[in-house]
């Protein structure tokens, strides 16, 4: 049995400890916002937080989450009220949308660590997240917009 918390809800699962966290999140917990992209931690589509740090869930064994807090895109906000989600919508970031949950999760860590990031900070933090539609300029603009919202008290 592996016990951990997902989006502030306790999970106690009888799964192989080496099972990738991604498949536990999607198949056992039914949280499908986290996407499978490459399976080798190169694209960032599967990014979740473990104790507040961005982790590629496609290669992280579920045992890594034991006793910890996992946050998925569903845990960022269930009603799209998180400043990043609002900024993503306002800047019309998604095209196909497949990479967006991973992009948002990486951006959330960035803004927690650097509330007013520079373009260079954003580029460095988001390097591991690939968008095959090429929406990088809109992603950067949305992160700046979210930083502004948070600075004005828009954080939840």
Residue ranges and their predicted role:
Residues 1-156:
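Signature of N-terminal electron-transfer/Fe-S-associated modules in redox systems
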């Amino acid at each position: 049995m592996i016990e951990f918390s997902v989006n502030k809800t306790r999970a106690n699962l009888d799964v192989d400890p080496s099972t990738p966290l991604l498949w536990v999140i999607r198949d056992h917990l039914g949280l499908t916002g986290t996407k499978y992209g490459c399976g080798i931690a190169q694209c960032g589509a599967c990014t979740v937080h473990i104790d507040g740090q961005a982790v590629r869930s496609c290669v992280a064994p579920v045992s890594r989450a034991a006793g910890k807090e996992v946050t998925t895109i569903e845990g960022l906000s269930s009603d799209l009220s998180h400043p990043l989600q609002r900024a993503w919508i306002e800047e019309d970031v998604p095209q196909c949308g497949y990479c967006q949950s991973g992009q948002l999760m990486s951006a959330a860590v960035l803004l927690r660590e650097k509330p007013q990031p520079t373009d260079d900070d954003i580029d460095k933090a988001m390097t591991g997240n690939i968008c095959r539609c090429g929406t990088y300029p809109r992603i950067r603009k949305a992160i700046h917009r979210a930083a502004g919202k948070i600075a004005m008290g828009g954080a939840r």
